[in-house]
Amino acid sequence: MEEIVNKVANSALEVFDLEDYYPKGIRSQIDISLWLLEGFLLKEKDFRAHLNNHDWSQYQDQYVAINCSTDAIVPAWASILVSIQLAPFAKKIVNGTIEDLDAALYEKILSEVDYSIYKNKSVILKGCSKKPVPMRAYVLAANYLQDFARSIMYGEACSAVPLFKKK
């Protein structure tokens, strides 16, 4: 009987797993609509009162996204004012969703990776993840890898989709 050989383990493929770069920490979202009259109308005096009475310390060392879940037309200064209140406590603040927050975190992290270790190698951008890796992170990682890798595939070694190959 022939010995079973794990061809994937013996291949020269390098796996780039975005989960390895997922920043640990609590992510929170602040919905400005909760401080609007009926979720739609910003009354400045009431809005500022809500901000003054809010316990900002609960966001200590957290990643925070500020958004408005309704279709309210909110002046730009409202989100800015919330971010100013958050600044002494939060690790990172973005205007948008949790996905926007994760994308911003990945932008910083991926810009600091040394991609030269992938020079002239076949790289698989690992596609299955248990953590919420935003699509923007995959696009950004592929763009960084393209400058170094001989080829880039997406997925798993057993079922990868070719994306790029140097000519």
In which residue ranges do the predicted regions lie?
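N-terminal, charge-rich interaction modules
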Residues: M1-I73, S79, S83, F148-S151, ...
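General structural feature for long, well-ordered alpha-helical segments within catalytic domains
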Residues: I4, K43-F47, A78, D102, ...
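A domain-level signal for the structural core that forms small-molecule/cofactor-binding pockets
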Residues: L51-N52, I93, S111, G127, ...
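Short glycine-rich or small-residue beta-strand-to-loop segments that form or flank ligand, phosphate
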Residues: Y63-S69, V94-G96, S122-C128
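Gly/Ser/Thr-rich loops at beta-strand to alpha-helix junctions
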Residues: S69-A76, C128-R136, S159
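Long, charge-dense
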Residues: A78-I117, G155-A160
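Short, non-transmembrane amphipathic alpha-helical segments
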Residues: L81-L86, Y138-Q146
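Extended, charge-rich low-complexity interaction segments
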Residues: Y115-V139
